[in-house]
Amino acid sequence: MACPRPLSQCDHTPLPGPPAGHWPLPLSRRRREMKSNKEQRSAVFVILFALITILILYSSSSANEVFHYGSLRGRTRRPVNLRKWSITDGYIPILGNKTLPSRCGQCVIVTSSSHLLGTKLGPEIERAECTIRMNDAPTTGYSADVGNKTTFRVVAHSSVFHVLRRPQEFVNRTPETVFIFWGPPNKMQKPQGSLVRVIQRAGLVFPNMEAYAISLSRMRQFDDLFRSETGKDREKSHSWLSTGWFTMVIAVELCDHVHVYGMVPPDYCSLRPHLQRMPYHYYEPKGPDECVTYIQNENSRKGNHHRFITEKRVFSSWAQLYGITFSHPSWT
C-alpha cells in the first residue's frame, strides 16, 4: 500500500520475506527436510501408540486381577472346612421328604471333557462307589470311555430342560441317580413358571426320581467360598460360578476321597500347542474349543462369565487338603 505522507516520513521497513541475499531453499533440500519432519512425526506417533497400548494392557490387567488367583489368595488364612457344612441345611428335597445321602467313601467326578474320549475308562468308573456327572452329559454311545453308572448328577438351571427332555437317557437309564439342581432364586423359585415346579411335574411322571435343590443359604455359602478363596466378590467381578464349582464342593462334602477324570490343570491352555484343537465337551465334537472357551471366559470383563481357570487354581489348592486326585490328564 502506498504511503500517503511525504516520502521522507514513510517507514522503509521491508516487507516480511527472505532476508536480503538469501534465496529460497532448493527443492531437493526442502523435500529432504519435509521427509525428515514426516519421519519425526511418525516416530512420535509410534511412541504414543506404544505408550497407549501399554496403558490399555496395564488397565486391562488391573481390571482382571480378580482372576490372578495366585497373587490374591491369603496364604496364612485358615481354609474353610467344607466337610463341616451341614448337608441337611444345604439341599432341599424337591420330590418327597427324603434327605440327601450323606456319605460316600470313594467318589469319581466324570467331567464332560473330550480328553476322556478313547481312554476306555468305563470299567474303572463303573467300579467306583459313587459316580458324579454334570448337566446333560450323556453316557449312551460313550460308555466305553465314561461308563454308565451315575450316583449323582449336578444340573445347572440352564440345563434343566435339556435333562428332562431326554428322560430315557437321564432318568430311566440310571434310575438310582440322585439329581442336585442349582440356580439363582429368580430362576429356581420365581412365582410364575419356576424350575422347581417343572421338576416336580417331572416327578409325577417318574415317581422314582429323586431330586434336590441347593438352598438359598447354601447358594450364599458358595458365593462366600469364592470370595474367601479368590479374594474377590463374585457379583462385583461379574463372575458366574460354574457347575464344576458346585460339583467339586458337593463331592468334597459327600465323599472321603475324590478322583476327577478329564479336568485339565489351570496352566494347560498356556502350554498346549496352539494348533491342537480339543472340543469343550466329549459329546459335541464340533462344539467350541476348550481353551478358547476357558480363555474367553477368564478374561472377559463385559457381562458375566465363568472363571474356569481361576476355579481350577482353587481346586488345585484343595487337592491335598481334601484328598482330591486328577487324571486324564494327571496333575495336582
UniProtKB/Swiss-Prot annotation:
The chain crosses the membrane at residues 43-63. One of its GO terms (biological process) is ganglioside biosynthetic process. It is a single-pass type II membrane protein. InterPro entries: Glyco_trans_29, GT29-like_sf. It catalyses: a ganglioside GM1b (d18:1(4E)) + CMP-N-acetyl-beta-neuraminate = a ganglioside GD1alpha (d18:1(4E)) + CMP + H(+); N-acetyl-alpha-neuraminosyl-(2->3)-beta-D-galactosyl-(1->3)-N-acetyl-beta-D-glucosaminyl-(1->3)-beta-D-galactosyl-(1->4)-beta-D-glucosyl-(1<->1')-N-acyl-sphing-4-enine + CMP-N-acetyl-beta-neuraminate = N-acetyl-alpha-neuraminosyl-(2->3)-beta-D-galactosyl-(1->3)-[N-acetyl-alpha-neuraminosyl-(2->6)]-N-acetyl-beta-D-glucosaminyl-(1->3)-beta-D-galactosyl-(1->4)-beta-D-glucosyl-(1<->1')-N-acyl-sphing-4-enine + CMP + H(+); a globoside MSGG + CMP-N-acetyl-beta-neuraminate = a globoside DSGG + CMP + H(+); a ganglioside GD1a (d18:1(4E)) + CMP-N-acetyl-beta-neuraminate = a ganglioside GT1aalpha (d18:1(4E)) + CMP + H(+). Its EC number is 2.4.99.-. This is Alpha-N-acetylgalactosaminide alpha-2,6-sialyltransferase 6. It comes from Bos taurus.
